[in-house]
Amino acid sequence: MWIKKRWRCWNVNVRVSLISQYNYVLEISYDGSQYNGSQYQPNKRTVESDLKKHLIYFFKDIENLIFAGRTDAGVHAVGQYVNFTSTYKLDTNLVRLHINKHSKYIKIIEFFIDKKEFHARKSAIKREYIYLFSTEQLPVYLSNYISYMDSPVDKVVIQECLNMVIGKHDFLVFQKTGSNVLTTIREIYHAKIDEFQYKVLTDSNKSIMLNKITIQGNAFLYRMVRNIIGAIYMIASSNNKLSPNDFKKLLLQKKRIFNFKPAPSSGLYLNKIWY
């Protein structure tokens, strides 16, 4: 049985099934500096609350949005995936255009209906995060999007430590304290640091050196990437006496043998997800 509706604002025919549910999938990007993380929190602005506000205008029966990965306050996404179910069947391209027009900090890249079994988090087989930082003074317009590190670092040491996380390990020491997961074992497929020059937009004669850390894995614990990079920064910093061997001990002993802080959220991006 079907019910037909016509929406005046878009002149879109909407078919509402009283039996079937459609599994909608979105690929989105967002500016994390505007949000208190991706996951819904009462009385706080989050990616989930903002996105749901736009979607519910069209899909009146939305209950839950399922995100492929959870991001902290200030963390950005280039290719985050979200799915939800609804009995409403709409033209996803028109909905995408409408939301992109009215949403400043969240943009929909792709929007489509997939098979019912698809689950944004559980169906993912690989994820990629990138982390951008510089030890040079940044233009103010980049301060929310690239992390500033106040001490020079040895990039050879950074890569040596990154090589240690490749493979299957227990990353217990790098998860946020108090996290509740079935297992803290994760597999990292790729971890690398690169550097490149960025031409300052407001001064054509000036450029700054940026560093990009890329990490790919099957899944990540909450705050795992920021903690790994924070610990490596402590070791690679020019004013520290720690060595890559200390990072190895940290990983193997699964306890904090030295204090470190998570790297600032501003430089972290959920970049890609594979299914």
What are these regions (language model features)?
Residues 2-8, 12-275:
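Structured-RNA-binding interfaces characteristic of tRNA pseudouridine synthases
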